[in-house]
């Protein structure tokens, strides 16, 4: 295989999106628009989040949680006793077969008395947490991080709205603390010696992968990752490497944005290369509320009309998550 070229992934200073300078916001929006119509990825810098602390706290959690604790937190795909845990909980590694492991948590406002929890509405779950005495401060940190990255995501959605010629709250009004289905996933890719062959996939072009090509199931995805190059995006010139940057957030659109904009902002197809290195991948999947519906539009059309049908976010999310598991396997 020849060398793989580097994808165009600009660094965009998103700090104006938190302020009131409309001209500065529009300049950011123009950069978001250009990136979204190119490779579909950009790095958000000057985002205001302490990512070094995020990385350190996540590392402490990953390195201290025991196999017994993981089992006690495992989602139902791994632990059949946990029938209410479809999304939230621990996703186990499988010795000799699957190396990656992760911990997923949802909206901290989904408490047992939340109306959606009471109604057993799909995709809504109460989070499960490890023992506070064994992981002091972890739950508090994780919940605070959810709201920190929620705030960043709200600002980014204003940038996307302006980029698409909409008023800045066009998306954000559907992204609310009381009902967002957004999730944080704390993914650990371990260094293993030997590394199990069964955990390595091979693409049609011969590239060894940890996770095969896919589009994200989200409106947008806000990703922090270690400074280890691993992601590739499909472009007209073939797959290209996305450079790692552990100071910024890697941003891309999910397939709900592609649906809404009639693929004006596509959901970039990307994949995870196999790299035998201890590293983190910590995505925040920006999801709207279960009943949220935004009418599709086409920015390229003079009247803005799209032939696509409106799709409730709850239906989109349920079907999208199942389809991704069916295609690429249980994460």
From Swiss-Prot:
Binding positions (2-oxoglutarate): 279
Cellular component, GO, one term: cytosol
Pathway as given in its UniProt record: Antibiotic biosynthesis; penicillin G biosynthesis; penicillin G from L-alpha-aminoadipate and L-cysteine and L-valine: step 2/3
Residues involved in isopenicillin N binding: 87, 91, 183, 189, 281
Effect of residue 98 to E: Strongly reduced the catalytic activity
Cofactor(s) recorded in Swiss-Prot or TrEMBL: Fe(2+)
Binding site for Fe(2+): 214, 216, 270
Annotated EC: 1.21.3.1
GO MF terms held by the record: iron ion binding; isopenicillin-N synthase activity; L-ascorbic acid binding
Compartments, as annotated in UniProt: Cytoplasm, Cytosol
Free-text remark on how the cofactor is bound: Binds 1 Fe(2+) ion per subunit.
Domain Fe2OG dioxygenase stretches: 176-288
Residues annotated to bind N-[(5S)-5-amino-5-carboxypentanoyl]-L-cysteinyl-D-valine: 87, 91, 183, 189, 214, 216, 281
Listed result of changing residue 272 to T: Strongly reduced the catalytic activity
Keywords from the named record: Antibiotic biosynthesis, Cytoplasm, Iron, Metal-binding, Oxidoreductase, Vitamin C
GO biological process: penicillin biosynthetic process
Principal localisation: cytoplasm
InterPro entries (alphabetical): DIOX_N, IPNS-like_FE2OG_OXY, IPNS-like_sf, Isopenicillin-N_synth_CS, Oxoglu/Fe-dep_dioxygenase_dom
Site note Transition state stabilizer, residues: 211
Catalytic activity annotation: N-[(5S)-5-amino-5-carboxypentanoyl]-L-cysteinyl-D-valine + O2 = isopenicillin N + 2 H2O
Function, as annotated: Isopenicillin N synthase; part of the gene cluster that mediates the biosynthesis of penicillin, the world's most important antibiotic. IpnA catalyzes the cyclization of the tripeptide N-[(5S)-5-amino-5-carboxypentanoyl]-L-cysteinyl-D-valine (LLD-ACV or ACV) to form isopenicillin N (IPN) that contains the beta-lactam nucleus. The penicillin biosynthesis occurs via 3 enzymatic steps, the first corresponding to the production of the tripeptide N-[(5S)-5-amino-5-carboxypentanoyl]-L-cysteinyl-D-valine (LLD-ACV or ACV) by the NRPS acvA.
Binding partners and assembly: Monomer.
Family listed: Belongs to the iron/ascorbate-dependent oxidoreductase family.
Name under which the protein is recorded: Isopenicillin N synthase
């Amino acid at each position: 295989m020849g060398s793989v070229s580097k994808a165009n992934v600009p660094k965009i200073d998103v700090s104006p999106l938190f302020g009131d300078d409309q001209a500065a916001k529009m300049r950011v929006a123009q950069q978001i628009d250009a990136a979204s119509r190119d490779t579909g990825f950009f790095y958000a810098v000057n985002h205001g989040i302490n990512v070094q602390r995020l990385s350190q706290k996540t590392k402490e959690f990953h390195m201290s949680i025991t196999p017994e604790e993981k089992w006690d937190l495992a989602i139902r795909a791994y632990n059949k006793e946990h029938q209410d845990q479809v999304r939230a909980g621990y996703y186990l590694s499988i010795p000799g077969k699957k190396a990656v492991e992760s911990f997923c948590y949802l909206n901290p406002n989904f408490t047992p008395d939340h109306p959606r929890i009471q109604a057993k509405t799909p995709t809504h779950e109460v989070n499960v947490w490890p023992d506070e005495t064994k992981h002091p401060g972890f739950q508090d940190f994780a919940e605070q991080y959810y709201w920190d990255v929620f705030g960043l995501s709200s600002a980014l959605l204003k940038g996307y709205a302006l980029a698409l010629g909409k008023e800045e709250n066009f998306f954000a009004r559907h992204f609310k603390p009381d009902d967002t289905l957004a999730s944080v996933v704390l993914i650990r890719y371990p260094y293993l010696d030997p590394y199990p062959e069964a955990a390595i996939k091979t693409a049609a072009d011969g590239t060894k992968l940890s996770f095969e090509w896919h589009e994200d199931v989200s409106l947008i995805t806000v990703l922090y990752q270690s400074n280890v190059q691993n992601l590739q995006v499909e472009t007209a010139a073939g797959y290209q490497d996305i450079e790692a940057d552990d100071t910024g957030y890697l941003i891309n659109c999910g397939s709900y944005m592609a649906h809404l904009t009639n693929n004006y902002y596509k959901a970039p197809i990307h994949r995870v290369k196999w790299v035998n290195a201890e590293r983190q991948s910590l995505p925040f999947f920006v999801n709207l509320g279960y009943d949220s519906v935004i009418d599709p539009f086409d920015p390229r059309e003079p009247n803005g009309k799209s032939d696509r049908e409106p799709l409730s976010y709850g239906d989109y999310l349920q079907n999208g998550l199942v389809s991704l598991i069916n295609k690429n396997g249980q994460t």
